[in-house]
Regions:
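N-terminal secretory signal peptides that target proteins for export/translocation
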Residues: 1-3
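Bacterial N-terminal signal peptides
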Residues: 7-18
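Catalytic glycan-binding domains that act on GlcNAc-containing polysaccharides
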Residues: 22-185
Length: 185
């Protein structure tokens, strides 16, 4: 019995080591749990969050859940309640189409219907779920995940989507440990 347990533990360690050898950075568990049912690789979801809400913390870039972008200006808040108050004010002053929210910076004007109320976009799990849904929808239109990420950012395409693809590909390369080239369809 003990030998079976030891063999199973060694096999698990080997598999974990093999996975880590092929990946420069393992996405946090929430990204893995949310990405799988949506059919999105967790590395893609995590890389989008790094691109959208990444901030430097203790020398590393990490996604920040209480991030807003209002009319092109980024804001990070220490608490969800502070971010919610600022979000409600931003919706009144700038309008929903000029406000992005949360880890995936989902635009309230285009995607507000995916939330029960605006501040739900600051719930990290809900925001990641919405982000994964949008990514899956964009991937279903064709192309690879880099192309889908470009459409996630700007469905109309053009140079803003191309810039986003290049920046996203850098994050995805870091996360996967694979040097990726962003295509420009």
């Amino acid at each position: 019995m003990a030998a079976t347990v030891v063999r199973a533990a060694l096999a698990g360690c080997f598999m974990l080591g093999a996975a880590l050898a092929n990946s420069a950075e393992v996405p946090p568990p929430a990204y893995q749990l949310i990405a799988l049912p949506a059919g999105v690789p967790s590395e893609v979801l995590y890389s989008v969050a790094l691109q959208e809400s990444g901030t430097r913390l203790r020398g590393q870039i990490v996604p920040w859940p209480w991030t807003l972008n209002v009319a092109g200006a980024g804001y990070r808040f220490a608490t969800r309640s502070d971010a919610c108050r600022a979000l409600m004010l931003a919706l009144q002053t700038a309008g929903p189409s000029r406000v992005d929210v949360g880890l995936g910076q989902t635009n309230i004007g285009a995607n507000g219907h995916r939330y029960s109320y605006p501040c739900e976009g600051l719930d990290p799990y809900k925001n990641l779920s919405v982000t994964a849904q949008i990514l899956a929808e964009q991937k279903a239109k064709g192309g690879d995940w880099i192309t889908a990420a470009g459409r996630y950012h700007r469905p109309a395409g053009g140079e803003p989507a191309a810039r986003y693809r290049r920046a996203f590909a850098k994050h995805l390369s870091r996360v996967t440990g694979i040097n990726l080239m962003a295509n420009n369809p």
